[in-house]
Design a protein with these regions (language model features):
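Ordered, soluble secondary-structure elements with a strong preference for glycine-centered loop motifs
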Residues: 1, 51-59, 119, 171
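Surface-exposed loop/turn segments and immediately adjacent short secondary-structure elements
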Residues: 2-27
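Charged boundary/loop elements
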Residues: 2-6, 67-80
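Conserved beta-strand/loop block within the catalytic cores
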Residues: 32-54, 58-59
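Conserved polymerase palm-domain catalytic core
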Residues: 17, 24-34, 38-39, 76-80, ...
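Hydrophobic alpha-helical hairpins/lids featuring a short glycine-rich hinge
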Residues: 51-69, 75
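Residues forming anionic-ligand binding surfaces in small-molecule and nucleic-acid pockets
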Residues: 41-47, 69, 154-158
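Short small-residue beta-strand/loop micro-motif enriched in glycine and branched aliphatics
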Residues: 46-51, 74-77, 108
Length: 188
């Protein structure tokens, strides 16, 4: 992240500031730092995937939120959703596809939501979260995480759309956003 903190430095920092961090989060006063933009080359020549790398403290907070969200949402996620889920993987998706094919189904729908993480609508996502989560402080903190500025070199830009790939909370937020689509596809 933009803090440049190593794991050892972070452990020392955490020992000295853990109570303060927890109190700030509980009070609703925590403000995430900018995420560091890193461009990762895609397989297609000349194409890049933007990652947003949070600071060490922000990463730990995001991981805690991701665990809470996973506990809340896992029971309502589609049984046929395999991405970014506990005990699920490409292997389990392939196994399920083989089972379905062996049942005689011959049609496949292949969806690729181009630049999905980069285009997540904050308002829609926050509404979905507000509908399910009882603690408004969690929704407010997620809103702050989504709005954390992006730092690329010396340039800092506001974030008004998307959830940066690279943070621990982004995959579960993506699954929450896509859950309605998953269930709609099941009905068809």
């Amino acid at each position: 992240g933009v803090d440049g903190m190593t794991v050892d430095e972070f452990l020392d920092y955490l020992r000295a500031h853990a109570v303060e961090i927890v109190d700030t989060v509980k009070a609703g006063k925590y403000k995430p730092q900018p995420v560091r933009r890193v461009m990762i080359p895609k397989e297609e020549k000349g194409k890049f995937r933007p990652l947003g790398i949070p600071t060490a403290v922000d990463r730990v907070i995001q991981q805690a939120i991701a665990q809470k969200l996973s506990d809340e949402y896992e029971p309502v996620f589609s049984l046929h959703s395999h991405g970014f889920r506990p005990c699920r993987s490409c292997r389990t998706a392939i196994d399920e596809a083989l089972d379905i094919a062996n049942q005689g189904y011959v049609w496949v729908v292949d969806l690729d939501l181009s630049k999905f993480f980069d285009t997540v609508n904050h308002s829609k996502l926050l509404q979905l979260l507000s509908d399910k989560l009882k603690d408004g402080r969690v929704v407010s903190l997620i809103h702050k995480i989504l709005r954390a500025p992006i730092q690329e070199g010396d340039k800092i830009t506001p974030c008004e759309i998307g959830t940066p790939q690279g943070g621990p909370v982004s995959p579960v937020l993506a699954n929450i956003m896509l859950n309605e689509l998953d269930h709609e596809l099941e009905r068809r």
